[in-house]
Amino acid sequence: MRELVLFLAKTLVDQPDAVQVMETEGPEAIILELSVAQEDMGKVIGKQGRIAKAIRTVVKAATDKNAKPVFVEIQ
């Protein structure tokens, strides 16, 4: 799942080398923390959060039904 978020974010930004995804696995969920360059933050979030919501929807759709839920946080 980490690679999927990394791919999606790198295709959206002007500085793909600055994109990082940290994965934290807890007892009930997996949290993916996406960080990008400050200048690219608007491109990843989008107007009214539409791009961020789309990224979260794709990740949710790619998650197995019986697996832990995956949450994407953008920093």
Q: What does each model-identified segment do?
A:
Residues 1-41, 53, 57-75:
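RNA-contacting regions in translation and RNA-metabolism proteins
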